[in-house]
Amino acid sequence: MSHRPKRGRERATLIGVIISVVGAGIIGLTTALTLADRGHSVTVHDPAPASGASHHAGGMLAPTAEVVYKQDPLFPLMRTSAEWYPELITLTAKYTDLPTGYRTDGTLVVARDIADKTHLSELGEYQSRHGMAVDKLTVRQARKLEPALSPAINGAVAIDGDHQVQPRLFTRALLDACRSAGVTFTGNHVNSLDALEADQVVVANGLGASALVPGLDLRPVYGDVLRVRVPQHQYPLLTRVVRGFVEDRPVYLIPREDGTLTIGATTREDGRDQPQVQGVHQLLRDAIELVPAVEECDFVEATAGARPGTPDDLPYLGRIDERTVVSTGYFRHGILLAALGARVGAELVDRQEPAIDLSACDPRRHS
């Protein structure tokens, strides 16, 4: 029995360029879907789709809360990608009914002690100077929004523009959407770009890109992430993302629709790819300091993933030759920057002028 080809594949067959995308994490999948929607014939090569950094990520779309001092070139990328995210969610929904976990509830950032309050205040001033919307709250106001917060916190701010997706749901939806759009998947591990039969190639396989493209200075930055389940009688424990500082250590708690909380994340460069006891202990301790009822939750899992970092923490995003576009090195911001990576990656493949200045992201800047 023959089946009528899906609309996406019909368009690709008629007008598309043949494109290979190396890597099926969040960047590779969103780029592949965007290219397929533009009418191209797309093949994705990855022996284990959505099993790398995307599998372990928290999924915060937080261009304001994720601000780090002295990383000014990163801010416009983060803000722009956050603005483009609704379009990416809409594109995904065009090809699949599977959920993405996209939520626009906003974020609270809280301070545990007086020193943390000072840090939060100084960070808020820095964010405001860069045009970011941050609303200062009293402890009473913060606890009215999230009653599970500890009465011992010392300060809080609300960031309504910081949202979230659930990465495991999102990548599952993207895989389904890509297939519906006509994308082909192989389980191949790519050892050489020359072996790919394609007009254009997008290298989006995270840390593995350095084996395919000389001159990329990528390093693995590991992070421990926890998941706990909220008891039914306490659900929902939180209604929005809660980030905080505990003795100057950052921690976040992300509520999910399935009744779990994601708690993260440590940052280490020790080469150890399993969750570390010290990191698990630190995250639980700090989460309980901010939300005491976490102590009553069921422990679900601890995972550790390697994020692809660069020397300046900016991604490698750009064309390196007539056939090859590089899109990797997104470090801690891969989920957030996926909307930008997908759209700009597709623009580069189509030889269009990118919608944002990419000069700081030149893949050759460290070679």
For the regions a protein language model found, what residue spans apply to each?
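Short loop/edge segments at beta-strand edges and connector loops
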Residues: 46, 138-139, 186-189, 301-303
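Active-site substrate-recognition segment that forms the wall
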Residues: 33-38, 47, 60, 98-102, ...
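C-terminal catalytic lobe of FAD-dependent flavoproteins
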Residues: 297-367
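N-terminal Rossmann-like FAD-binding beta1-loop-alpha1 element of flavoenzymes
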Residues: 18-43
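Conserved Rossmann-like nucleotide-cofactor binding loop
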Residues: 27, 50, 208
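Helical element adjacent to the flavin cofactor pocket in flavoenzyme catalytic cores
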Residues: 157-193
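Short hydrophobic core segments
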Residues: 22, 197-208, 342
